[in-house]
């Protein structure tokens, strides 16, 4: 074997130029998603425009189309990022987990998210109140499977005597309702708390 054959080939995707392009892509996508989230909250899905999102992101409209193709794809990306962030608190939940620790962490995480970024909750609420036209399929498949998986773990906890909850779905709904209330009705909550 020659010395040249022994050398590892450098992949085109592992060059400094490619890594730089990936970093720019990630940065642009993050800028666009943040701008889109703001625009959708302020203007609604119907009122938001790709130009408005581009202006808010400080990027050319062509970049927004390059990364997300159209408004619907961008809106779905924003909604999915919201759901993904919310559900992170229960990702590592297993039958061997301590229910008190898991549920407490989930509630604290959800409350923190509601206080830090209430607009995300408002955007999701607007979508759901409107009949979830963009999320209906996602909610009836991916989200439903996720909830079912978490409910199964909670049922196992109940069988093991770790929790007294017999209907885990109702517990999840109660946690969502309670934590999201702080964001969706921020004006009311702040007024009641004299803040």
Please provide the spans of the model-predicted regions:
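Amphipathic alpha-helical packing segments from all-alpha helical-bundle domains
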Residues: 84-91, 116, 133-159, 170
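Helix-turn-helix
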Residues: 2, 31, 39-73, 77
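Hydrophobic/aromatic-rich alpha-helical bundle segments in the mid-to-C-terminal region
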Residues: 123-126, 136-140, 155-195
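Short helix-capping/turn signature of helix-turn-helix
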Residues: 68, 126-131
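An amphipathic alpha-helix adjacent to DNA-recognition modules
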Residues: 26-34, 46-47, 67-91, 140
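Hydrophobic alpha-helical connector segments
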Residues: 77, 91-122, 168-175
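N-terminal intrinsically disordered/low-complexity leader segments
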Residues: 1-27
């Amino acid at each position: 074997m020659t010395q040249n054959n022994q050398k590892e080939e450098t992949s085109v995707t592992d060059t400094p130029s490619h890594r730089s392009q990936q970093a720019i892509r990630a940065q642009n996508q993050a800028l666009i998603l943040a701008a889109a989230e703001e625009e959708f909250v302020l203007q609604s899905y119907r009122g938001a425009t790709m130009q408005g999102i581009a202006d808010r992101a400080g990027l050319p409209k062509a970049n927004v189309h390059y990364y997300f193709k159209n408004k619907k794809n961008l809106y779905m990306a924003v909604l999915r990022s919201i759901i993904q962030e919310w559900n992170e608190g229960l990702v590592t939940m297993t039958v061997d987990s301590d229910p008190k620790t898991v549920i407490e962490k989930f509630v604290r995480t959800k409350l923190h998210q509601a206080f830090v970024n209430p607009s995300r909750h408002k955007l999701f609420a607007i979508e759901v109140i409107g009949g979830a036209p963009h999320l209906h399929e996602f909610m009836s498949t991916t989200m439903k499977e996720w909830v079912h998986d978490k409910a199964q773990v909670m049922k196992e906890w109940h069988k093991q005597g770790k929790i007294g909850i017999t209907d885990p779905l109702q517990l999840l709904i109660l946690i969502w309702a309670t934590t999201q209330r702080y964001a969706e009705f921020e004006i009311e909550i702040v007024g009641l708390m004299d803040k």
